[in-house]
């Protein structure tokens, strides 16, 4: 598993930008949200009272709380529809014994903090794979003294010539980076959708419509409104405790349990639902944009030209970026690397680099 210090380092600002804004939404923003949520859930679980159950005669309250926390609590499904104080005391809670088929057991709550942390690792993985495959290809092309847009110097001209020659010698060598980049961006979409499936399974197949149900319920009149959150994150539940009676028989004793931890859990997953839906949508749009860039080579030239001083000579840009001797994947790789390089430099420097490239390639 990835060390914690590497995970934290991926959240810090980078000196050389080698990924897209979409990548940062996954590997930085989403990871930060998940780690913060995991810490909050961990605090609620280990540094407060996550569960509080009513007393059972002859049994320590601490034992009852621990038992119900580590074993499955449940709701009575036939008592989840209706209104508090009229149809039931609390949603999913009844005084009568219930058939096992009428019970919905809840077992997710002790694992929330761990699952959120593992999800954070999953969102780091595509970016980690991309940077591992990329290596130092961009940093080796970019020298620190090229960032300055000051006056001309002998050293600067030497570095510009070196970069232009290195580029001419390595044209067509970055095709595998284009394939890897597209694969990792696609993996971002697969991961976010997969995580939504995972959460849905983890919460008992209630996550997919979680946010939409909340929005729909909030628009209903108050007299017919139902507490949607109580069905997924109940604040009150039942727990069956088994013990030996005076004559050696096994007695089933039911207790009512309060779950303060679910006040936090419901807020965490509300935020996650809206964020993951937005993230999946933005990632889909970004992949559609990448597909358009791949299918329209002239768009690649426009993107590079936008990072040069105006007016940019598109013929010079096309000559530096696209070689007729290379196939489509190799040209895409050259464009990708040059686009990342220019994203780290100012327009004045980028313009000089294109001029030197044309001189060397001519």
Q: Locations of the language-model features?
A:
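Membrane-embedded alpha-helical segments and the immediately adjacent membrane-proximal loops
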Residues: 1-362
């Amino acid at each position: 598993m990835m060390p914690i210090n590497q995970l934290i380092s991926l959240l810090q600002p980078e000196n050389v930008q080698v990924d897209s804004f979409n990548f940062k939404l996954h590997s930085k923003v989403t990871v930060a949200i998940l780690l913060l949520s995991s810490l909050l859930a961990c605090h609620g679980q280990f540094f407060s009272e996550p569960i509080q159950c009513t007393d059972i005669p002859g049994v320590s309250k601490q034992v009852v709380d621990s038992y119900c926390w580590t074993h499955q609590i449940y709701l009575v499904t036939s008592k989840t529809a209706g209104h508090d104080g009229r149809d039931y005391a609390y949603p999913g809670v009844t005084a009568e014994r219930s058939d096992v088929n009428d019970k919905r057991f809840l077992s997710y709550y002790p694992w929330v903090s761990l699952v959120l942390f593992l999800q954070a690792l999953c969102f780091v993985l595509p970016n980690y794979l991309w940077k591992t495959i990329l290596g130092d290809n961009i940093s080796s092309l970019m020298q620190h003294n090229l960032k300055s847009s000051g006056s001309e110097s002998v050293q600067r001209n030497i570095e510009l010539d070196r970069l232009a020659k290195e580029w001419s010698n390595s044209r067509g060598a970055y095709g595998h980076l284009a394939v890897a980049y597209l694969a990792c961006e696609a993996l971002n979409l697969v991961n976010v959708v997969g995580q939504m499936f995972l959460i849905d399974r983890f919460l008992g197949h209630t996550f997919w419509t979680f946010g939409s149900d909340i929005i729909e319920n909030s628009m209903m009149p108050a007299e017919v409104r139902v507490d949607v959150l109580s069905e997924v994150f109940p604040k009150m539940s039942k727990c069956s405790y088994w013990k030996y009676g005076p004559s050696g028989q096994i007695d089933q004793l039911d207790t009512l349990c309060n779950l303060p931890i679910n006040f936090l859990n419901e807020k965490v997953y509300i935020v996650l639902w809206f964020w993951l839906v937005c993230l999946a949508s933005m990632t889909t749009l970004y992949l559609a944009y990448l597909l358009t860039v791949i299918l329209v080579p002239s768009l690649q030239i426009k993107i590079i030209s936008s990072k040069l001083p105006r007016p940019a000579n598109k013929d010079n840009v096309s000559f530096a970026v696209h070689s007729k001797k290379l196939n489509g994947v190799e040209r895409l790789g050259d464009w990708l690397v040059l686009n990342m390089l220019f994203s780290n430099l100012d327009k004045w420097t980028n313009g000089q680099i294109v001029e030197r490239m044309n001189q060397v390639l001519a």
